[in-house]
A protein has these predicted regions:
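Glycan-recognition and catalytic cores of secretory/periplasmic carbohydrate-active enzymes
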Residues: 1-235
Length: 235
């Protein structure tokens, strides 16, 4: 598909081949088509959904798995986390083992070093998004390596908290700001940590998540019935 893709450096959309991830790309289209096929059961959309991942396979052949991580980052919106999520969920909906195997293969080639190098941290671009994708791979395939890496993601997130001006610890993400919200803020990271706590039962993940939620709540503006936009520049 050709799709409008936003380029932050240009502050405009450009028409180009759809990217690989969930947010505005092929993995997201695959999820929609797989859901549609699951509801209708006609067989009309199955091959189309599976075919959405052909560009991913082609890109891996060109740059390798390490190159893919460098190119896309880790996140759950546009990065490797989104590919893991898309492959695992689409494979489960369609009962397509090839996609589940691809999710497992991609997981096995991820390294703790790539997680340690991540500075984005958030759900769309960083470690929290990878964590959510890894948990889905573990849930759908039982792959132990996925949970091992998810724990490492959790440790990375806990280790990068800083004390906020209002008290609770949270994270610097987009443009170095301590944002709120699901995409780039404390809410998304806290959600990922709560999911990890659910999968492991380890209390430190829950405690870090609850402190992140306390940070979010401290910034709520009751008069506006909303949270302030703390971004320093447009996305």
């Amino acid at each position: 598909w050709i799709a409008p893709t936003y380029h932050p450096d240009l502050h405009r959309f450009l028409l180009q081949p759809a990217p690989l991830g969930v947010f505005s790309g092929n993995a997201g289209i695959a999820l929609f088509l797989a859901g549609l096929e699951t509801v209708l059961g006609t067989g009309e959309f199955r091959d189309l959904a599976v075919g959405c991942f052909a560009p991913l396979r082609a890109r891996v052949r060109q740059v390798g798995h390490d190159g893919l991580v460098r190119e896309l980052g880790l996140g759950g919106g546009t990065g490797v986390g989104s590919l893991l999520y898309g492959l695992a969920r689409t494979g489960t909906l369609l009962r397509e083992d090839r996609l589940l195997d691809q999710a497992r293969d991609l997981t096995m080639l991820l390294t703790q070093r790539s997680i340690d190098a991540d500075v984005h941290l958030d759900a769309v671009l960083g470690t929290a998004g990878l964590l959510l994708g890894l948990l889905v791979v573990h849930e759908t395939t039982g792959e132990a390596r996925a949970l091992e890496l998810a724990r490492h993601c959790g440790g990375h997130l806990i280790g990068h908290r800083i004390k906020s001006e209002v008290g609770p610890r949270a994270w610097r993400t987009l443009n170095g700001s301590m944002l709120t919200g699901l995409s780039h803020g404390a809410a998304g990271i806290s959600y990922a940590l709560l999911r990890l706590h659910q999968a492991t039962g380890q209390s430190e993940y829950e405690q870090a998540a609850l402190e992140g939620i306390a940070y979010e709540r401290s910034l709520y503006v009751a008069q506006a019935k909303n949270w302030p936009d703390l971004r320093r520049s447009p996305e």
